[in-house]
């Protein structure tokens, strides 16, 4: 596994555990379709949450959350709509969150959950 893929997988594991500890239920991981991938899909009460996970091992290239651009948010909205259609899912509300994971040199993770970014 490439280093970039390994740190991404690490971040997604950390993010999933973080969300579950916060009371969300992760219902899908790494959902793929020809248009792209959703890292995590979760339920927060009656709200369906589409989660983009961004992981970095340093701040040299900025905060992980800064990597989610307007273009990326537009893609996430399209992917969320496709996921909802393909799963015939119904939710009172839908939201897009970002979980930013910074892996420190000591191997610990600093996690920031940004709710409703899209």
Curated annotation (Swiss-Prot):
InterPro entries in alphabetical order: Restrct_endonuc-II-like (IPR011335), tRNA_endonuc-like_dom_sf (IPR011856), UPF0102_YraN-like (IPR003509)
Pfam families xref list: UPF0102
Superkingdom, natural source: Bacteria
One example GO MF annotation: nucleic acid binding
Family classification: Belongs to the UPF0102 family.
HAMAP family per the UniProt record, alphabetical: UPF0102 (MF_00048)
Protein name in UniProt: UPF0102 protein Bcav_2532
Source organism of the structure: Beutenbergia cavernae (strain ATCC BAA-8 / DSM 12333 / CCUG 43141 / JCM 11478 / NBRC 16432 / NCIMB 13614 / HKI 0122)
């Amino acid at each position: 596994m490439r280093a970039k893929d390994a740190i991404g997988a690490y971040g997604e594991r950390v993010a999933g555990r973080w969300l579950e500890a916060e009371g969300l239920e992760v219902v899908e991981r790494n959902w793929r379709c020809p248009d792209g991938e959703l890292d995590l899909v979760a339920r927060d009460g009656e709200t369906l949450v589409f989660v983009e996970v961004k992981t970095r091992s340093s701040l040299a290239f900025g905060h992980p959350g800064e990597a989610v651009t307007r273009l990326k948010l537009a893609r996430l909205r399209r992917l969320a709509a496709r996921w909802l259609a393909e799963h015939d899912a119904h939710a009172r509300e839908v939201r897009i969150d970002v979980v930013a994971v910074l892996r420190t040199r000591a191997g610990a993770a600093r996690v920031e959950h940004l709710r409703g970014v899209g």
